[in-house]
């Protein structure tokens, strides 16, 4: 089980690197799907099945919208692939920054600990609902900030896709 969780963590990091160094929206969405599946699988392996399912459904809906808009904006007949030297350079640069951050910060700052509510014997399902309660009690500010950011992103994408048309107002 430890190796499986380590594999999911590695897939999550590689998916994030694929999104950060995406040469084309066609390949960037593959990185998004890989990162979201690995992250939700990671949560599922920790026993947080409800939150994992909700996040997976939200990620799939959001990724579908972002993929459709980004493909409509950048319809290249010959998209760059991940094997191009420019893209490989971006990926190596991101890995170098990640390794430098670990070397400078050290591994001690990652010891956040784990707090469980009631995960003994038959009550292991309580852990999942305790996490949902923590989302809405302590994480309400982050939810509001994330919702505001997503709303702003939606309007920015809609404005970019609209182009020069004025909607119902016509030029005289």
Curated annotation (Swiss-Prot):
Its main location: mitochondrion. One of its GO terms (cellular component) is mitochondrial membrane. The chain crosses the membrane at residues 1-21, 27-47, 48-68, 87-107, 138-158. It catalyses: a ubiquinone + NADH + 5 H(+)(in) = a ubiquinol + NAD(+) + 4 H(+)(out). Keywords: Electron transport, Membrane, Mitochondrion, NAD, Respiratory chain, Translocase, Transmembrane, Transmembrane helix, Transport, Ubiquinone. InterPro entries: ComplexI_Subunit6 (IPR050269), NADH_UbQ/plastoQ_OxRdtase_su6 (IPR001457), Nuo/plastoQ_OxRdtase_6_NuoJ (IPR042106). The keyword Phosphoprotein does not apply. Its EC number is 7.1.1.2. It holds the Pfam family Oxidored_q3. It is found in: Mitochondrion membrane. It comes from the Eukaryota. Belongs to the complex I subunit 6 family. This is NADH-ubiquinone oxidoreductase chain 6. It comes from Uria aalge.
């Amino acid at each position: 089980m430890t190796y499986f969780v380590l594999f999911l963590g590695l897939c999550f990091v590689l998916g994030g690197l694929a999104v950060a160094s995406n040469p084309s929206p066609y390949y960037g969405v593959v990185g998004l799907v890989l990162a979201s599946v690995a992250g939700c699988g990671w949560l599922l392996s920790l026993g947080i099945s409800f939150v994992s399912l909700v996040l997976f459904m939200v990620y799939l809906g959001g990724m579908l919208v972002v993929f459709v808009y980004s493909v409509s904006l950048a319809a290249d007949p010959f998209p760059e692939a991940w094997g191009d030297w420019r893209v490989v350079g971006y990926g190596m640069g991101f890995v170098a920054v990640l390794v430098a951050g670990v070397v400078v910060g050290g591994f001690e700052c990652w010891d956040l600990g784990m707090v469980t509510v009631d995960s003994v014997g038959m009550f292991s399902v309580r852990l999942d609902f305790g996490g949902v309660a923590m989302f809405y009690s302590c994480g309400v500010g982050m939810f509001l900030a994330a919702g505001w950011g997503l709303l702003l992103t939606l309007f920015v994408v809609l404005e970019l896709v609209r182009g020069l048309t004025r909607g119902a107002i016509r030029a005289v």
